[in-house]
Design a protein with these regions (language model features):
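Asp-box/WD-like beta-propeller blade repeats and closely related beta-sheet repeat scaffolds
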Residues: 1-34
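Conserved serine DD-peptidase/penicillin-binding transpeptidase domain
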Residues: 32, 39-41
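Beta-propeller domain segments
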Residues: 39, 46-178
């Protein structure tokens, strides 16, 4: 993750604020958003469907990370001295907060079991050991899609211009759905 400073439409400084995030050819996550708490949230993907890095709290693979804007770790993160906010993710694609500050995330499954999740601090969402359905160890998805739809970006709509007030809108990467 780079912080880029500009002046007069030119890059004047580039600073790495987080490095060593594992990547792969197909599944990388890659979403960055500032939350209502002014922290930077980063969705990282699992490097392969056979990797168990999403379950390893020392790995940055398959996680939602939470950072201060300078790349330091917030004191109130759920895992002490760690950027990990939640784990057990395969391929995070969309993030949005509702008016109450709850974080929702879309996640693409391997060929089915795409998910919409309500993210809780410090919780495990199961990948690659479990998909969609929770148990005492893993958090269940709010919604699971089979066949897969490849969910992408999401946003909450609270306006009054469309007849869809208080709705979560989701774009899909497969087909042509909204």
């Amino acid at each position: 993750i780079l912080r880029v400073s500009e002046s007069q439409n030119k890059i004047v400084e580039t600073k790495t604020i987080l490095d060593k995030i594992p990547g792969s050819t197909f599944v990388n996550g890659g979403i960055l958003k500032f939350g209502p708490d002014e922290k930077l949230y980063v969705g990282t993907g699992s490097i392969s469907d056979s990797s168990h890095g999403s379950q390893d709290l020392k790995s940055l693979e398959g996680k939602i990370l939470r950072l201060n804007d300078d790349g330091t770790i917030p004191d109130d993160n759920p895992i002490s001295d760690s950027p990990v906010f939640s784990y057990g993710h395969r391929d995070p694609k969309g993030m949005a907060w509702d008016k109450d500050g709850n974080l929702f995330m879309t996640e693409i499954g391997p060929s089915k079991n795409d998910e919409i999740n309500l993210i809780h601090a410090g919780k495990n969402y199961g990948w690659p050991e479990h998909e969609c359905i929770g148990n005492g160890k893993f958090i269940a998805a709010l919604n699971c899609y089979d066949p897969g739809i490849e969910p992408g970006g999401i946003v909450f709509y609270y306006g009054d211009k469309l007849d869809i007030k208080k709705s979560l809108l989701m774009a899909t990467l497969k087909g042509s759905h909204l």
